A protein has these predicted regions:
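Conserved pre-motif I regulatory segment
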Residues: 1-38
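Conserved nucleic-acid-binding Ia/Ib motif block in the N-terminal RecA-like helicase ATPase lobe
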Residues: 3-8, 62-117
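Walker A/P-loop NTP-binding motif
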Residues: 23-35, 45-60, 81-85
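Generic leucine side-chain signal with a strong bias for well-ordered alpha-helical environments
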Residues: 35-38, 50-51, 68, 74
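The conserved Walker
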Residues: 39-43
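Gly/Ser/Thr-rich beta-alpha loop segments that engage phosphate groups in nucleotides
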Residues: 44-46, 98-99
Length: 117
């Protein structure tokens, strides 16, 4: 597994502390539990599931996770948050409305560990 420093990620995201939901999610992930998050928009769900996701990735340059979302805008937003975490883990978003060959080229050159689509 990749060593991820949560405090460093929070500092990069300009977050002083985790919300109760985010803290519970991190704790339950460490216990090996499956999680379902139900919470209003803007409550921090993205960070709540991205922190355990990045902690679960191995130090291998292969695709390890796919995050499925209902819209292009949300895919781009999550990709941006992921990159802002500053982990150095390669991530890309894939969505309709752009040439498939462009995505294929990007995927081959980037070799993402995480795809958001």
């Amino acid at each position: 597994m990749t060593h991820i420093n949560i405090k460093e990620i929070l500092w990069k995201l300009h977050i002083d502390s985790l919300t109760a939901m985010q803290q519970t999610t991190v704790e339950e992930y460490r216990k090996g539990k499956d999680l379902v998050l139900l919470s209003p928009t803007g409550s921090g769900k993205t960070i709540a599931y991205l922190l355990p996701l990045v902690q679960s990735l191995k130090n291998e340059n292969v695709l390890q996770a796919v995050v499925l979302v209902p819209s292009r805008e949300l895919a781009l937003q999550i990709e941006q948050v992921f990159k802002s975490m500053g982990t150095g883990i390669p991530v890309m978003s894939c969505y309709g409305g752009r040439p498939a060959m462009d995505e294929h080229r990007t995927m081959k050159s980037l070799n993402p560990q995480v795809i958001i689509g």
